[in-house]
Amino acid sequence: MKGTPQNMQQNPQYENVSKEVLDFFIERTNTCSQAGIQDMIIDIGFGFGKTVAHNFQLLRELSVFKMLHKPILIGVSRKSTIYKTLGITAEEALNGTTVLHTIGLLNGANILRVHDVKEAVECVRLFDAYQA
């Protein structure tokens, strides 16, 4: 995330969001490993200091984060990326959430942070059946 929670959405700028976030996590995971911390989860921060275009780029390029050899968490549930793109409200974003969960799983996500547990479980079960 660039900036602070108070100003992170005010014109976020990245030359290449995926590369910059990956470089950040390479440095942080190395620092943690050197300090003896091995159990880490990578949360690339969808929606935090990023535009809709940044979020879609991160989702498309999610697999590059596998090089960190850590579980990848995505938190796309009801995010503004969905309702801004579809012109709906957060409360109406369940279908969009499920689509982004599926794309995330296909691109390497291991953990979903969700609001709608039943629907997310169904998504993961179908994904697992597809992968079998």
Predicted regions and their residues:
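Active-site-adjacent loop and "lid" segments of alpha/beta metabolic enzymes
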Residues: 1-34, 49-132
